């Protein structure tokens, strides 16, 4: 049975960092929607031209566009044995579309992690990332907008996955290795249960 993992959490919670480690440690495809969109912008593709102003303003990319992007990516050969989703879903319609996509192929999510960090810690991490990486979407205005959108649009997904019974809350305001050790333990338990 494939191992399919989803990471939720406010921007700056450490989703990208932990997703890379999970993918590497368990041999899973790392599906990072933010990275996919930034690559499309860098390539100058039609998709990139459409999403660049959206990302730079801190807004969410429209559901239909994100759902199609994920649908295509989940059909890739490297995702057959499992994947880590980082940055999708961000809205209830996206979550429902993902549930439907996975049900169609008989692959329910193995485990959903909510990386929990206080907003002030997330903001501090994002400002540091902006200084170190110079990402155009990490301006103070965009960060504030993304936090607001997370609490309004994405945070309700925590309740959705809690009802489905596969949500694991992880306190992300700790050293990276401690967070990952707890994630590893939960993934091992999810594998045994499936």
Pin down the residues of each PLM region.
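Glycine-rich phosphate-binding loop of ATP-dependent small-molecule kinases
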Residues: 1-194
């Amino acid at each position: 049975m494939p191992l399919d993992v989803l990471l939720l959490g406010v921007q700056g919670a450490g989703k990208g960092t932990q997703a890379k480690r999970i993918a590497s440690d368990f041999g899973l495809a790392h599906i990072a929607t933010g990275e996919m969109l930034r690559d499309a912008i860098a390539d100058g593709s039609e998709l990139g031209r459409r999403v660049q102003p959206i990302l730079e303003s801190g807004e969410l990319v429209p559901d239909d566009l994100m759902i199609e992007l994920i649908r295509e990516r989940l059909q890739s050969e490297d995702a057959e044995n499992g994947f880590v989703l980082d940055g999708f879903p961000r809205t209830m319609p996206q979550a429902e579309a993902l549930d439907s996509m996975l049900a169609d192929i008989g692959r329910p999510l193995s485990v959903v992690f909510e990386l929990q960090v206080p907003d002030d810690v997330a903001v501090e991490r994002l400002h540091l990332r902006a200084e170190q990486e110079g990402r155009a979407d990490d301006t103070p205005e965009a960060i504030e907008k993304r936090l607001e959108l997370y609490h309004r649009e994405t945070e309700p997904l925590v309740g959705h996955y809690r009802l489905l019974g596969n949500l694991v809350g992880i306190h992300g305001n700790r050293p990276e290795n401690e967070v990952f050790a707890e994630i590893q333990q939960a993934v091992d338990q999810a594998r045994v249960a499936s």
